[in-house]
Amino acid sequence: PVVHVPTDVYPPYYIYDTLEVGNLPDTVWIVGPEIFQDSATQFFAPVNDPELIWLESQAYHNYSLAVNPWSLGVASFDGLDENGFPYNIGTTLTNYADNLTSKPIDMSGVSASDSVYLSFLYQPQGFGDEPEGSDSLILEFYAKDLDQWNWIWSTQGSPLTGFEPVHIRVDNSDYFKKGFQLRFRNYGGLSGSLDHFHLDYVNLRTLSGYQDTVVRDFAFVYPIHTLLETFTSVPWDHYKNAPIGKMSSSVEVGVRNSDNSPENEQDGAIEIIYGGSQEGSFILSEALLNNGDLNYLPWTTYYSYHDFSAGDRFDETKTGLYEEFDIVSAATHQNSNFTLNDSTYSKQYFQNYYSYDDGSAEQSYGPTGNQSMLAIKYTPYEADSVIGAMIHFVPSVIDVTENLFLLTMWDDNGG
């Protein structure tokens, strides 16, 4: 297959040719261009992948932006494009932003008598930005023979709520064609990660009914990002020099029973995998997972905390400069429909840095006002030198790429 590497450059910059003194640049040279290209992308025809469901990647598939999701992963809509840049930074205008469009679907073999329904869950805001009342999440259907997208459903922006179910019957003959599509769009701010809506459990099916609104599933709601106490990542040599007492005493596990009836609980497990082989395991006690209830109650999310400070740990005898381990977690009940949601996979990285976060950005934080400062404290496992810092700057609302800031390192002063 064709291999390509997309490269995005932001903000735009000029490249000066200095190969020979006095020569004109040997690339296209425009003084004061009215337009500029701020990214370089190579396009290839996609392979016909039968597992592919959606055509675009503008909506952001993530595991952290939703509050109390029903399962692992949501599609989030905001004012950032597929590369994480604002559609129009600096503007106060609102317009259509992200699209999530299905592949063409062959609906020629079904009719209204087959009781076709589309269902999904949505949530405004989540851990992100509250969408205003003038913002909206929109569902449209494509009528192939008419070459026309039609409005089907929408909801206005609002403060944070739990996930709301939507259940829509498809009974218009215009949609029972080969080439039917559906798409979700958001209308909101274009200048950054703003006006969030989150989408989950999109399900188009036959032989349904108006009362068929139950999502019979048992699922993790968030991945487990770290088994370490305090940090999500530490330098490997710091860990292996003193591994005792570094495993977490409070690993958070979130699971949900979305069925409308109680379900029997079972023990779960977390395994440490290295190079495809299991090197350690921990039991997720059913009594902790369900907070002591006799069964998993209907439509209930449970958060529990598990002590892994004793027992297995990451094998400190590994000799690599950097190391990484797979964390495989599993928990279920007896009647789960979507077994992919019964497990969650993540990696424990040991490289050359300390980190507290999971690598995702739900909101932007920063100092405001003149001469303001922001500090974050790290207490390393052992004395060492600081040679750099990695910071994620979220392009949002105002272009600050020309603003100056000073990166300062403070030594510990008994604080």
Located regions from the model:
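Topogenic and prosegment regions of secretory-pathway hydrolases and membrane enzymes
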Residues: 219-225, 231, 264-270, 304, ...
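Beta-strand-rich binding/interaction modules
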Residues: 248-285, 403-409
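Beta-sandwich/jellyroll recognition modules and their flexible linkers
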Residues: 1-266, 349, 356
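Intrinsically disordered, low-complexity Pro/Gly/Ser/Thr-rich segments with frequent PxxP/GP/PP motifs
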Residues: 274-317
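Generic detection of short hydrophobic beta-strand segments and adjacent strand-loop junctions
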Residues: 17, 105, 166-168, 286-288, ...
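Beta-sheet-rich sandwich/jelly-roll-like modules and their strand-loop junctions
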Residues: 328-414
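Surface-exposed loop/edge segments in extracytoplasmic proteins
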Residues: 26, 145-155, 277-290, 414-415
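Short, aromatic- and glycine-rich surface loops/edge beta-strands on solvent-exposed regions
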Residues: 182-184, 304-344
